[in-house]
């Protein structure tokens, strides 16, 4: 499957991306390479191959949740450049 420049432009519009002419050319080539690779993968005979989610056997690495103590407010704010009472103070980012 060969991807066209028009298809790349369409995908860019859907993603609300403004691409330059050079970027369109670059992405058209890159997406074409990716689709060619996927076509090769689709052509592989995987009959009789057991589906796996990991290439190597893995066991659940989760640990049990255990409640532990936390540091106090003063220790948490010890190195804060700005603070207001018991809170971190940060620059305003929304007008």
Curated annotation (Swiss-Prot):
Keywords: ATP-binding, Ligase, Nucleotide-binding, Protein biosynthesis. GO terms for biological process: glutaminyl-tRNAGln biosynthesis via transamidation; regulation of translational fidelity; translation. InterPro entries: Asp/Glu-ADT_sf_sub_c, GatC. GO terms for molecular function: asparaginyl-tRNA synthase (glutamine-hydrolyzing) activity; ATP binding; glutaminyl-tRNA synthase (glutamine-hydrolyzing) activity. It catalyses: L-glutamyl-tRNA(Gln) + L-glutamine + ATP + H2O = L-glutaminyl-tRNA(Gln) + L-glutamate + ADP + phosphate + H(+); L-aspartyl-tRNA(Asn) + L-glutamine + ATP + H2O = L-asparaginyl-tRNA(Asn) + L-glutamate + ADP + phosphate + 2 H(+). Disulfide bonds: none annotated. Its EC number is 6.3.5.-. It comes from the Bacteria. Heterotrimer of A, B and C subunits. Allows the formation of correctly charged Asn-tRNA(Asn) or Gln-tRNA(Gln) through the transamidation of misacylated Asp-tRNA(Asn) or Glu-tRNA(Gln) in organisms which lack either or both of asparaginyl-tRNA or glutaminyl-tRNA synthetases. The reaction takes place in the presence of glutamine and ATP through an activated phospho-Asp-tRNA(Asn) or phospho-Glu-tRNA(Gln). Belongs to the GatC family. This is Aspartyl/glutamyl-tRNA(Asn/Gln) amidotransferase subunit C. It comes from Geobacter sp. (strain M21). The lineage of its organism: Bacteria, Pseudomonadati, Thermodesulfobacteriota, Desulfuromonadia, Geobacterales.
């Amino acid at each position: 499957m060969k991807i066209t420049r028009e298809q790349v432009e369409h995908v860019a519009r859907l993603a609300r991306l403004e691409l330059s002419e050079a970027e369109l050319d670059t992405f058209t080539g890159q997406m074409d390479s990716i689709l060619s690779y996927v076509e090769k993968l689709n052509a592989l005979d995987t009959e009789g191959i057991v589906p796996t989610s990991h290439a190597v056997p893995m066991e659940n690495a989760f640990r049990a949740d255990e409640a532990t103590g936390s540091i106090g407010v003063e220790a948490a704010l010890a190195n804060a450049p700005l603070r207001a009472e018991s809170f971190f103070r940060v620059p305003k980012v929304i007008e």
